[in-house]
Amino acid sequence: MTRFLTLLSCGFFLASCSAPPADAQLSDQDRDEVREIVREYILENPEIIEEALVELQRRARLRESQAQLTAVNAQYDAIYADPRDPRLGAEDPQVVIVEFMDYKCSYCRVAAEWVEDVNERYGDRVQFIFKEYPILGPDSREAAIAALAARRQGDDVYANFHYTLIRASGALPSERIDQLASLAGVDVAQMRADMDDPAITAHVDDVRQLGRALDVTGTPFFIIGDTLVPGANGMALERALMEELNG
């Protein structure tokens, strides 16, 4: 083993940017020995390849998360201080949770159960900011615009419509959006009139641009303090929330 470590360490030193002295270089025979020892070790312990791949993926995710956190800091005002964004929960919150969501996203439907539960448990301490982020087709975009238009009729109207839309599965053609809006207590005629306001479509476009800046490639996507949680990972969401509440 000592011979193996000595040869292997020399091999790594040779591969570095600084060349070692000539008398420290490996001979051809030593190089062959290193290759054979490494080969035999891998053949006898093939699981090390899987371990290496897992570690490689972990490091890649860490780099991606760090890059996204840097982007979050750069886009702080657009994320947290846009008055156009719908909000739910505490007016003076201890914790703010941001969710990028799409009404056609089945995982958003799962995550909505956690959102509702948190609002029931910590509605006086937690505030949600919803980023309407339609990425699943034209009907997703129409539903997002409809929800933002309905918000002009009141935050409670928006909340009812938001959860009605998110619980609906399948396609969202115009007729179905209107039906769901009516069920949620929305004045559909007024909603449709407000949907023609360029300010609302501009808001949706701005959120899309923000999502691209943050490299949000799927929904749901949560920002909880310094923790980014892609997907409907209930355990990760709850852990991040508890860290913020108890931090």
Please describe what each predicted stretch is.
Residues 18-20:
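Bacterial signal peptide processing site
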Residues 28-32, 43, 106-109, 137-141, ...:
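Soluble non-cytosolic domains of exported or imported proteins
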Residues 63-87:
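N-terminal "domain-start" segment that seeds a small globular fold
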Residues 78-95, 120, 208:
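A short beta-strand-turn-helix
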Residues 98, 103, 109-182, 212-217:
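Structural alpha/beta surface segment adjacent to cysteine/selenocysteine redox centers
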